């Protein structure tokens, strides 16, 4: 059973069986939105158990994912991008295909992240800002997201909590009770994570890079997409070293036309790493996996390549300005603290590099959430939208 440290208690809901077009019958369910593609009672009970952690604001929700999301099948499905991921969700997780077109599934991530020991204890911390701008099509009008915290406890796997930007499946703030949004795409949540932590204290996050997307094509390896990889790591990796070994067994494909990603990961032993896919010829897709670790300069990361392979390219550390100011501020702050920080100091570093509504209008220019992970205690303290005086606490029961 996942231990929940949020002050909101999730109440169990009771449901009668529904036909394809029925809305949930329980009077305690706050929504009348449909879930057209779901007929299985367990799936319907799950998607109708979403909890708004602020009551009725529609800004941050929490859900425990209680059915099988078929990770083994996902790892063999050849998911090389968002289109194939959407197909997997429709064919393997839905009970029937939709009568209308599925919502567009998109994916992106700006962000800043770092790892360090807690200066007042033996705990290890990871800090993370998720930065991303959503604009209404053809405008500069910002659309606000719902954050969704997703608890999972797969059979034979590790318990975890991960965090999703609901806008990537076209859910706006307040979608759950807007009487319009179909809830079927909540089935995709395990594969939409942007960061998370498991019961072993292993945490992983994804951050955007400029340039062509990663495309590995080893005929002897199955192909996986960014978020499928992260789901695999949270479900199966206990440490950074195990995670690196798992990634080496797969072709990584990232399908953004003009962007790629790198992973930042850390664990409860104090280990940390940046995993990048590189190619010094920027006219070709990155295809060589590199795990960068073992020195304090790699404790923080933003949105340019840190690999020496990429250093002198336009997207590398010597020439790219994408996230450079944030990176320098993180490096400087960590150095001032001698690469150790209390949770409050870690939060302060996130505040320094957070981006507000008057900052960059680029895709990575708006901080949606900020987290201090305690990898030793398996907890996450989150603030949304730079509301630093208000936090949401999440946790996982530690492995015995």
Where on the chain are the PLM-derived regions?
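Hydrophobic alpha-helical transmembrane segments of integral membrane proteins
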Residues: 8-9
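Non-transmembrane alpha-helical segments in soluble domains
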Residues: 231-234, 244-247, 331
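Secretory/export targeting leaders with adjacent low-complexity proregions
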Residues: 245-255, 263
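Extended amphipathic alpha-helical segments with heptad-repeat/coiled-coil character used for oligomerization
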Residues: 257-311
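Long, charge-rich alpha-helical interaction segments
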Residues: 314-343
């Amino acid at each position: 059973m996942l231990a929940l440290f949020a002050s909101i208690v999730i109440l169990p809901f009771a449901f009668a069986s529904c036909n394809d077009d029925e809305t949930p019958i329980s009077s305690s369910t706050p929504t009348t939105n449909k879930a057209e593609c779901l007929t299985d009672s367990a799936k319907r009970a799950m998607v109708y158990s979403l909890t708004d952690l602020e009551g009725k604001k529609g800004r941050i929700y929490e859900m425990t994912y209680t059915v099988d999301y078929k990770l083994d099948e996902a790892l063999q499905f050849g998911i090389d991008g968002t289109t194939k991921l959407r197909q997997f969700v429709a064919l393997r997780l839905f009970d029937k295909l939709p009568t209308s077109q599925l919502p567009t599934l998109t994916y992106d991530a700006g962000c800043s992240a770092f790892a360090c020991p807690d200066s007042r204890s033996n705990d290890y911390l990871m800090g993370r800002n998720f930065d991303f701008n959503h604009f209404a099509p053809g405008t500069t009008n910002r659309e606000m997201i719902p954050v969704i915290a997703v608890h999972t406890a797969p059979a034979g796997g590790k318990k975890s909590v991960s965090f999703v930007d609901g806008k990537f499946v076209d859910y706006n703030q307040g979608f759950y009770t807007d009487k319009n949004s179909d809830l079927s795409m909540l089935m995709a949540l395990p594969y939409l994570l942007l960061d998370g932590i498991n019961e072993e204290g292993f945490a992983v996050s994804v951050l955007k890079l400029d340039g062509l997307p990663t495309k590995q094509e080893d005929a002897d390896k199955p192909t996986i997409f960014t978020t499928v990889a992260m789901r695999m790591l949270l479900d199966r990796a206990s440490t950074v070293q195990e995670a690196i070994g798992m990634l080496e067994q797969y072709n990584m494909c990232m399908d953004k036309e003009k962007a790629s990603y790198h992973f930042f990961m850390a664990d409860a032993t104090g280990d940390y790493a940046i995993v990048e896919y590189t190619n010094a010829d920027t006219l070709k897709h990155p295809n060589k996996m590199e795990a960068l670790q073992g020195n304090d300069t790699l404790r923080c990361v933003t949105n340019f390549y840190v690999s020496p392979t990429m250093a002198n390219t336009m997207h590398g550390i010597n020439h790219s300005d994408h996230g450079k100011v944030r990176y320098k501020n993180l490096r400087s702050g960590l150095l001032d603290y001698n690469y150790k920080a209390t949770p409050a100091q870690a939060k302060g570093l996130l505040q320094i590099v957070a981006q507000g509504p008057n900052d960059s209008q680029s895709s990575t220019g708006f901080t949606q959430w900020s987290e201090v992970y305690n990898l030793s205690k398996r907890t996450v303290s989150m603030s949304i939208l730079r509301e630093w005086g208000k936090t949401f606490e999440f946790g996982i029961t530690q492995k015995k």
